[in-house]
Amino acid sequence: MNFAIETVNLNVYYGQNHVIKDVDLKIPNKGVFALMGPSGCGKSTMLRTFNRLIELNEDARVEGEVRLFGENIYSEDVDPIEVRKKVGMVFQYPNPFPHLTIYDNVAIGLKLNGLVKSREELDERVEWALKKAALWDEVKDRLNDYPGNLSGGQRQRLVIARALAMKPEVLLMDEPTANIDPVGTAKIEELLLELKEDYTIVLVTHSPAQAARVADYVAFLYLGELIEVGPARKVFENPEHELTEKYVTGALG
């Protein structure tokens, strides 16, 4: 099997606090892979190791390997900026740039990184990304408006479009529906099912129900340890570990 991300003996510390403990994990290429577990189990920390965003925290220390399509992204000769071009990130709170128009929110990464050669190419890429994020039809007549008037779900899809415009190979999502209403959540979950045909999506979720709805594979983390990993249906219908069973049935919060 072709793996998009592999961790080898991954350990993460915040100061003296050991938050990810000896995790070996393989994330297949393409599809939705959910990291699930209760609050404080290390899900978001692990996600941030996959694009080296963890290094923005001065107290963080990473040991072991994280391989992106076979390459250890923590090797000394690897530029974290180049890693983040390949690995997009969507955060829990919809965070479009409020001072930029809808158009410029999508275009900014392309401009800053010189990824397009003409205004025509930029227009095409912005339209493509907004269509990929299932937002084009809702905003095509107001691209010069600011995102403040968009709903929470629309703002999050705008952020997804901003990430997709860079044409990443992997998309990391840290509880992307946690602060969005049920209608917006349903649209984003539907979008994930479409995007997984072309991307590897790693989704952090506190909701076993959401993982069951959208994930092809799931990993259950508890207190920084990888308890169980496998195809979503198997983990939910026939978990091997008692802790996993308690979590997916709601007995462990």
Swiss-Prot record:
Chemical reaction(s) catalysed: phosphate(out) + ATP + H2O = ADP + 2 phosphate(in) + H(+)
InterPro entries the record matches: AAA+_ATPase (IPR003593), ABC_transporter-like_ATP-bd (IPR003439), ABC_transporter-like_CS (IPR017871), P-loop_NTPase (IPR027417), PstB-like (IPR005670)
Any Gene Ontology CC annotation: plasma membrane
Entry binding sites for ATP: G37, P38, S39, G40, C41, G42, K43, S44
Main location: membrane
Location relative to the cell: Cell membrane
Residues annotated as domain ABC transporter: 5-248
EC annotation from Swiss-Prot or TrEMBL: 7.3.2.1
Membrane topology, as annotated: Peripheral membrane protein
GO BP annotation list: phosphate ion transmembrane transport
A GO MF term: ATPase-coupled phosphate ion transmembrane transporter activity
Coiled coil spans: none
Keyword Repressor part of the UniProt annotation: no
SMART domains: AAA
Keywords: ATP-binding, Cell membrane, Membrane, Nucleotide-binding, Phosphate transport, Translocase, Transport
Enzyme class: translocase
Subunit structure: The complex is composed of two ATP-binding proteins (PstB), two transmembrane proteins (PstC and PstA) and a solute-binding protein (PstS).
Family named by the database record: Belongs to the ABC transporter superfamily. Phosphate importer (TC 3.A.1.7) family.
NCBIfam families membership: 3a0107s01c2, PRK14267.1
Role noted for this protein: Part of the ABC transporter complex PstSACB involved in phosphate import. Responsible for energy coupling to the transport system.
Protein name: Phosphate import ATP-binding protein PstB
Source organism: Thermococcus kodakarensis (strain ATCC BAA-918 / JCM 12380 / KOD1)
